[in-house]
């Protein structure tokens, strides 16, 4: 599973090419390189760290090292499939709802674990947000994590080990990721793609993590949605309530456009793997794909909220005359105009409306209703009679 490399870690372990991307987490990089070199991989890992610390990147890198015949060259067909999320032996699970994992998701996972790998010698199961494994789901998973087949590796991730049920933590090797500074996060984005520092800063504000920021910058559709949202924000004070409701509807429609790319990727992956799948497995994949589309739609709305929050924070800087560069420099004119028409308390009220929208989304309130109420509340807050600043 390992490959000799011209790269080495700080403790001189051979470093597979796939692990070179973990340079911002040298301790993690060294731990995984050593485990691969000594053929002592754990059967279950728990990656813990703040969002944006590179847990997802590390999970993909480890999967590449394990499944690639060259030990993680990051260039072969298997590695490319893993990078794109289409490898049939790498299964990524995310919570089916804002409240956590469904017991049915875990039962499907357990049933799949017993099946042989399709392309490689091993299978990897990545369980994101392991802190959202509720007691019934966690209990169903315990024995499988504790005694998985020899060809199976679990990689769980969470913000902290204390947020995960102790029974799960005790069955995993915990790997801690340090929090990246803003400068390191921007540098990671700029290493990954050709982006300016300002583009990286804007993308980070919209998405929260370097990995998602890269995806954002590579998506013309998502960048267009941001531009549309800036226009809505700029016209909010001059538009009437009907215009605001129309804007909310248009934003919801725009948020659905990127889902077409997700559907096409799902269909491509299904076409590549359907010869290996039983009819029952096909149904499981289709159900998982539907859950992914629902989750992606929700994440698109959350991204809109983050963009609005970033714009409002820039307005707040202007209202308070803080000597600090705004994030959304490409919307500086709009930000200055809104700041001249409102005051600090109004902006704080608008920010509270964004937080309330996040709360409502977490409780499965309709996305369109959530946006409508939020935009109306932001308009109301910002148009309060100006106070002395």
Range-by-range predicted roles:
Residues 2-64, 77, 81, 150-152, ...:
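Charged, glycine-rich active-site and insertion segments that engage polyanionic ligands
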Residues 31-35, 103-124, 132, 136-143:
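Conserved alpha-helical scaffold flanking the Walker A/P-loop in AAA+ ATPase domains
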Residues 308:
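Conserved phosphate-interacting/catalytic interface
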